[in-house]
Amino acid sequence: LQADDTLMAVTTLSFDIAVLELYLPLWVGAKIIIAKKQDSSDGRRLLSLLIKHQANFMQATPATWRLLISSGWQGEPRLKALCGGEALPLDLAEELLQRCSELWNMYGPTETTVWSSCAQITQTQTPPGLGLPIANTQLYVLDEQLRPVPNGIAGELYIGGDGLTLGYNNRDELTRKVFIPNPFGDGQLYRTGDKVRYTHDGTLTYMGRLDQQVKVRGYRIELGEIETLMRQHDAIDDCALSVREVRAGDTRLIAYVVWKNSPISLSELREHLRQQLPPYMVPQHLEALGELPRTLNNKLDRKALESLPLSESSSLGKEEVRAATTATELKLLSIWQEVINKPISNINENFFDLGGHSLLIAQIIHRVEMDMSVQLKFSDLYEFADIESLAKKIDQS
């Protein structure tokens, strides 16, 4: 970042990577444009801001970059793009390289203060690497006995250096578990829980999580926390969650449930969870099972769970079914089915219960504008969250 650059800040202040957006421009004398929440969550409005202010530097999660691309962004030849918060998919890296001058893959957990490593991506024949550690930071790939593993062998990533925090406030047990004495020098190491390996050419690559903590659209989620709350519902005997990428860039939370007696609908389950969880932690799909898959040791077999096919309908309750009849309803039905990637038989079904989320809203808005010459706002999909009510809103306007 240089003094004559303009940085577009799109990160919420509660997300640690906002630190870079707030302070880096001050350090170098660059210009900063702070996007409002309604702008950063709406691809078209964010695109307008980028053009209006001629921003040439932006940091965002993969979900936000996809939001921008799905809203028709063709790129900016001067733009330096930083992508972090969760793994940078290969297909998104290819899209971004076509649209900007530089692409950087950023990696770092909150516990080590924003970023710990970075890699400039120049080609996309292989999945983007995590790069090299930033100044005053050390990266170690270790086995269960805290021994370095050879190149090509997977291990857990440990981070040391000046960026380490002191631990978790009022959570001494967790602090002792993940902040350990550095066996290779002074200070401590942070145990990330990330599975990585060095390839034979020295590239550090991300291979997933070693625990149940996952990231969905940039949010860090503990699956066990959601499962505990689900089991509190009277209708649920047992349950488990998994994260499934139903197609490139569209990652969803899947709830697998064993019912006690009578099943409930996905909308009922989501309403139960909404009272206790933020929206990004509420599952988008519900799959009923006779029993959860188990290993020989009678532990939950999450790999088997993730390999199960998703049913076409994820809602199990008895709900009023209404088919599309008007021209507007039929057109919206076609768009929704393509974007959500599943057949829809009931135009009264809620967009979010069908698996919708903010990234898909951007795609629907773009498709409606292209195919129907109608401009919608992000808030419209929250206020008119089924095809029937959205069609009426469009017809009345």
Residue ranges and their predicted role:
Residues 1-151, 156-165, 184-190, 213-214, ...:
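Motif- and composition-driven signal specific to adenylation
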Residues 24-26, 241, 286, 368-369:
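Short hydrophobic alpha-helical segments of the AMP-binding
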Residues 29, 85, 194, 202, ...:
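Conserved G/P- and acidic residue-centered "switch" motifs that form tight phosphate/ATP-binding loops
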Residues 102-105, 120-323, 329, 333, ...:
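AMP-dependent adenylate-forming
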Residues 221-225, 330-337, 349-373, 385, ...:
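Phosphopantetheine-attachment site and its flanking helix in carrier
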Residues 274-281, 340, 383, 397:
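A short N-terminal helical cap/helix-turn-helix that marks the beginning
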Residues 310, 333-344:
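Amphipathic, well-packed alpha-helical segments that form the structural scaffold of globular domains
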